[in-house]
Amino acid sequence: MVIHTFAFRWKAGVPENQKSRAVAEIRGLQGHIPGLLETLVGVNISPRSQGYELGGVMKFSDRTALDAYGGHPVHQKLLQWLMPLIDPIEVDFEA
């Protein structure tokens, strides 16, 4: 199993409806991406967030599934509108 973690800082001026859309669309990836076993995403509640407002964890069956996720059309469609709005960080590891 491979764990994909991410956190976002929103760029200035991003409206709440876009933030909510991001959460909904990330959750909606489940069932569309082969090998994506579980998706958890939510608004950060930690006082130690260093400005990261949204975080998530995705569990993939293996590295091949994680690699395929990166180029999957559904993921790419999400990234097309989301990337200009965020400052992201990602960490992936085998579990």
Residue locations for each model-derived region?
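Short S/T/G/P-rich N-terminal loop/turn motif that feeds into the first structured element of a domain
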Residues: 1-53, 61-68, 92-95
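C-terminal structural segments of small proteins and small subunits
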Residues: 60-91
